[in-house]
């Protein structure tokens, strides 16, 4: 493998939300495998999604995720494009199932975006909000004013813009809990069952 084009003293470390610093060794391996994945003679980006090599990559990714997140066998793992923003519309389109109301806990900018998108599909009940103190806390669950028949309760479990994070999993009883965990997924154990 060739020497890294970045000298260690010149390397910039990003500790911001979102993209993060990666070890140079990982980047170097990715660089080489991008061009020729495991000596297959082509890049992963050039492979057929039905081809043997790519099917093996997808199966290994699912197995790894199941192991890391302790996902039970009875659950499906979906690898979807679009990120959290697309899910703001995909979730209500798929989970309303005849319900008219969605409950939200509004803890910041990402919650507000999810609420705005959900309003296109259903009535939105903001069960709790920390807007009164500029989104600097998570409201205690005992203060939430939930709907009786909500399709689900939505939280953004880590508001990266304001720096507010749920350090607990809300008990929603029989109401499904939807958590936007896109900024901290796999950062701690989560009971997905």
Regions inferred by a protein language model and the residue ranges of each:
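Gly/Ser/Thr-rich loops at beta-strand to alpha-helix junctions
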Residues: 19-22, 84-87, 108-111, 160, ...
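PLP-dependent aminotransferase-like
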Residues: 85-153
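Short active-site oxyanion
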Residues: 75-77, 100-103, 174-176
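Basic/polar N-terminal segments that are highly enriched at the extreme N-terminus
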Residues: 1-11
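Conserved active-site segment immediately N-terminal to the catalytic lysine
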Residues: 178, 192-193
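Conserved N-terminal alpha-helix of the aminotransferase class I/II PLP-enzyme fold
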Residues: 41-87, 94, 108-109, 117
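A glycine-/small-polar-enriched, mobile loop at the entrance of the PLP active site in fold-type I
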Residues: 11-62
């Amino acid at each position: 493998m060739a020497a890294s084009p970045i000298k260690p003293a010149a390397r910039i470390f990003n500790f911001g939300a979102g993209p993060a610093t990666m070890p140079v060794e990982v980047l170097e391996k990715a660089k080489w495998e991008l061009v020729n994945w495991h000596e297959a003679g082509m890049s992963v980006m050039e492979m057929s999604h039905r081809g043997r090599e790519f099917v093996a990559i997808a199966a290994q990714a699912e197995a790894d995720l199941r192991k890391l997140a302790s996902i039970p066998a009875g659950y499906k793992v979906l690898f979807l494009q679009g990120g959290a923003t697309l899910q703001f519309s995909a979730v209500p389109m798929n989970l309303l199932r005849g319900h008219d109301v969605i409950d939200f806990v509004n803890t910041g900018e990402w919650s507000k975006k999810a609420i705005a998108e959900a309003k296109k599909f259903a009535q939105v009940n903001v069960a709790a909000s920390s807007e009164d103190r500029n989104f600097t806390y998570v409201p205690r669950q005992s203060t939430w004013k939930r709907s009786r028949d909500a399709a689900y309760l939505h939280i953004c479990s880590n508001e990266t813009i304001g720096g507010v994070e749920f350090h607990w999993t809300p008990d929603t009883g029989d109401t499904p809990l939807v958590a936007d965990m896109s900024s901290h997924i796999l950062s701690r154990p989560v009971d997905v069952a």
